[in-house]
UniProtKB/Swiss-Prot annotation:
PANTHER family: MULTIFUNCTIONAL PROTEIN ADE2, SI:DKEY-6E2.2. NCBIfam families: purC. The keyword Repressor does not apply. InterPro entries: SAICAR_synt/ADE2_N, SAICAR_synt_PurC, SAICAR_synth, SAICAR_synthetase, SAICAR_synthetase_CS. The gene is purC. It catalyses: 5-amino-1-(5-phospho-D-ribosyl)imidazole-4-carboxylate + L-aspartate + ATP = (2S)-2-[5-amino-1-(5-phospho-beta-D-ribosyl)imidazole-4-carboxamido]succinate + ADP + phosphate + 2 H(+). Keywords: ATP-binding, Ligase, Nucleotide-binding, Purine biosynthesis. It comes from Shouchella clausii (strain KSM-K16) (Alkalihalobacillus clausii). Disulfide bonds: none annotated. Pathway: Purine metabolism; IMP biosynthesis via de novo pathway; 5-amino-1-(5-phospho-D-ribosyl)imidazole-4-carboxamide from 5-amino-1-(5-phospho-D-ribosyl)imidazole-4-carboxylate: step 1/2. Its EC number is 6.3.2.6. Belongs to the SAICAR synthetase family. This is Phosphoribosylaminoimidazole-succinocarboxamide synthase. GO terms for molecular function: ATP binding; phosphoribosylaminoimidazolesuccinocarboxamide synthase activity.
Length: 239
């Protein structure tokens, strides 16, 4: 198998063509960004940590019957994935008030929600990735109503599994962002990554943060926080 031409470069990853049809080569970057790229820094070792954590979580979810684009880890910073057409929606699941929800609604961070909240954001950097309703999604015509229902169902299933996974290692899953894509056959698959870049993760007892808020809010060393998550998960699971 051979890495082909560069197809796309985003804030955190590069996507390459693979010599195998229907597969893509993902390379994680050491770049950390926040506020739609307004804050940016290169942090040595971040690519390896995100690749390892995301590979581990995708492999764990696969064992629980939740399909994703992930095929296998290729190197410290690379993984092989199934080619999908990404749906331009970020699916955010919230278990505890934090981040933009706290700011938007004037609610104190750290308050547990009575039930998980699922939100949709339209992926458009120029618009600032706005929060959208299901009616907005229909107007934008980016996903059919039955697909939106399936996205919510899959997001809820991922939430249940991740809550259990992180609780086992003393970590509280505050909220997280998912992306999904369609295969050529029309199957919806979990895509992108699941890592401290896309999840808020707090120590269950001390509420210490192990996620991108370390960088976003200048709360501490990002690599140390991510390494703590990998070390805790690595004690139980192996890719």
């Amino acid at each position: 198998m051979v890495k082909g031409e560069l197809l796309y470069e985003g804030k955190a990853k590069r996507i390459f063509r693979s010599s195998e049809e229907g597969e893509l080569w993902v390379e994680y970057k050491d770049d950390a960004t926040a506020f739609n790229g307004e804050k940016k820094e290169t942090l040595a070792g971040k690519a390896r940590l995100n690749n390892d954590i995301s590979s581990l979580i995708f492999a764990t979810l696969a064992k629980k019957g939740i399909p994703s684009h992930f095929i296998r880890r290729l190197s410290d910073t690379e993984q092989l994935v199934k080619q999908v057409d990404i749906i331009p929606l970020e699916v955010v699941v919230r278990n505890v008030v934090a981040g933009s929800m706290a700011k938007r609604l004037g609610i104190e961070e750290g308050i547990a929600l009575k039930k998980p909240l699922v939100e949709f954001y339209y992926k458009d950097d120029a618009l600032g990735d706005p929060l959208v309703t299901e009616d907005h999604i229909a107007i934008l015509d980016v996903a059919a109503a039955e697909e939106v229902a399936q996205l919510k169902q899959m997001a809820a299933a991922v939430n249940n599994e991740l809550i259990e996974l992180f609780a086992t290692v003393g970590v509280q899953l505050i909220d997280f962002k998912l992306e999904f894509g369609r295969t050529q056959a029309g199957e919806l698959l979990l895509a992108d990554e699941i890592s401290p870049d896309t999840c808020r993760l707090w120590d269950k007892d001390t509420k210490e943060r192990f996620d991108k808020d370390l960088f976003r809010r200048n709360l501490g060393n990002l690599q140390e926080g991510y390494q703590e998550i990998l070390s805790r998960l690595g004690g139980l699971y192996h890719v």
